[in-house]
């Protein structure tokens, strides 16, 4: 989120950018069918019907996260709901479980994607193997590998 805002600032793009988080997991760590959305309160207070909102996600696969975000916004904003568009670098049409699709995308794929910033699900050994620049940090915060 911060990197996006910095890019907008450097490019001189006037924006009111915020990060929204979604989760499919309950407090017990089990996957839910419903999506939990966090961080909409600022948008709900600020949005007006004449505004335009671009929702950007790293991957549009099932579409459930974006669908829930838009549902929650429309429910809360009512007549103040702005025009909403969706952008993503990666679109997985074969995985889409909604009637939505992104307005803008760069690539269509059905492959599993792993982004350079992702660490979740990797063992310490896999992190060191694939991201050797993190070894010194890992050595300080975890037992020897």
Model-derived regions: residue spans:
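PRPP-associated nucleotide enzymes
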Residues: 1-145
